[in-house]
């Protein structure tokens, strides 16, 4: 008698892999359309057509357009390598931690700057996306606050408290500054990262 259990297990794995591929194809199709046409001008039906799936499949995978964008946001930091950032933060002194954070932001903006800009602009008229953008921004601020608050007393420059340090970082390392330096001033992403690293040390640390 032949045991059919392995076959059933393989079939389950195949279905799971296919479902993951379908989700990825839908997400990539949505990103292309959102960036090219804008959030408001893109319908779920168009996303389905672009991905080569049915409309119910899109809804089953992500719920709605906001669910699609949230999934894109969750995946956006993967190319930026958050594990690398974590490792660098755990073992570095403050100047190196700032450099690690600048490097992460550079990688994030390089790979997903178009998506970040889309969400922020669409959030001006779409409440769900405004909420999403605010949540992401606050999460980033929270990480910076956690890092800065762990530094020994006297690490920050005189007159710079924790809140000011977080604000200063956000004012320097953001998608607008990155975009201007890359598109208008002709800088390379690596040069932006190096400049951020140097200016953050000058602005934040007592040296």
Q: For each of these PLM feature ranges, what is it?
A:
Residues 64, 112, 125-126, 175:
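Short loop-to-helix capping motifs
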Residues 3-4, 123-125, 141, 158-182, ...:
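Hydrophobic alpha-helical segments that form the core
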Residues 19, 23, 73, 102, ...:
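Amphipathic, non-transmembrane alpha-helical scaffold segments
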Residues 61, 71, 195:
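Residues in the recognition helix of alpha-helical DNA-binding motifs
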Residues 71, 84-111, 165-166:
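Hydrophobic alpha-helical connector segments
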Residues 1-56, 60-63, 67:
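Basic, helix-initiating cap at the start of DNA-binding domains
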Residues 106-112, 117-120, 128-153, 163-167, ...:
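Amphipathic alpha-helical packing segments from all-alpha helical-bundle domains
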Residues 69-76:
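Alpha-helical DNA-contacting segments of helix-turn-helix folds
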